[in-house]
Each structure stands twice: as C-alpha cells, then as structure tokens.
C-alpha cells in the first residue's frame, strides 16, 4: 500500500511540474503578442542545399555532354 501511494505521489508531482512548465511557456508566448518564430535546423538545411547544388551542377554538365553528343551525331563529325 505504501509503495502504491508513493508511486502515485511521484506521478502527481511530475504531472504538476509538467503542467506548470506548459503554463509558463504559454504565458511567454502570450507576452510575445502571439508571434511565432520559425527555427530552421542547420544540418538538414545544409544537406538539402548541398544536394540541390550538386544536382544543378551535374544536370548542367550532363546536359552539355548530351547536347554536344547529339550535335556531333547530327553533323556526322564524331
């Protein structure tokens, strides 16, 4: 019986702390007049930018070689 009361007391304490943190966060948001800031994560943004840059560069290079090959075959100068 004592261990059950003890565990319920711990759960109540943790719930109270969690609730008070949520209330503080909500109050802090209300002080900012409801402005929501968007935070970008650095690693994923960096990876996304790098893949786009590599994709554009490879696309241009492959496009040039493909066009040169087609022009060569059309003019029979290969």
UniProtKB/Swiss-Prot annotation:
**What keywords is this UniProt entry annotated with?**
Amphibian defense peptide, Antimicrobial, Cleavage on pair of basic residues, Disulfide bond, Secreted, Signal
- Tissue/organ expression: Expressed by the skin glands.
Name of the protein: Lividin-4
Task: From the Swiss-Prot or TrEMBL record, state where the protein is found.
Answer: Secreted
Q: Which cysteines are joined by disulfide bonds?
A: 72-78
A GO-annotated cellular component: extracellular region
GO-annotated biological processes: defense response to Gram-negative bacterium; defense response to Gram-positive bacterium
Q: Which InterPro entries match?
A: Antimicrobial_frog_2, Frog_antimicrobial_propeptide
- Chief place where the protein resides: secreted
Q: Does the keyword Metal-binding apply?
A: no
The UniProt record lists the keyword Mitochondrion: no
């Amino acid at each position: 019986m004592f261990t059950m009361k003890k565990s319920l007391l711990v759960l109540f304490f943790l719930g109270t702390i969690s609730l008070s943190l949520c209330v503080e966060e909500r109050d802090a948001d209300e002080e900012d007049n409801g402005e929501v800031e968007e935070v970008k994560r650095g690693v994923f943004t960096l990876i996304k930018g790098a893949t786009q840059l590599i994709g554009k560069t490879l696309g241009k290079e492959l496009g040039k070689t493909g066009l040169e090959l087609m022009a060569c075959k059309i003019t029979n100068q290969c």
